[in-house]
Amino acid sequence: DIISSGESVLDMAYALKKKNARRFFAYCTYALYTNGLEKFDKAYEEGYISGVFGTNLTYRSPELLERPWFHEVDVSKYIAYFIASINHDVSISTVLDPHEKIKTLLSKHQ
């Protein structure tokens, strides 16, 4: 959910690598990285982590965004859905429910 120093993420990566994991990716909502970028650089260079995915829901430092192992996930579209749902007093589940979209796409190709 939140990566601050990243110690727990790196602990998982090291443990899984010992169990012969080929690749390790981490995902977090808030990539704060208050410290610890160098530890992630080293883990990436040594093959312990393949990448980290973090959303654009909080500030990401230019130093973090330059890292080859960090991948930003743009969730602004979903924030717009949340705001629209609140403003129209509807459940977000009806907005994000993919079933109707899938049915519509399938009907176009039958």
Regions found by a protein language model. Give the residues of each.
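PRPP-associated nucleotide enzymes
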Residues: 2-110
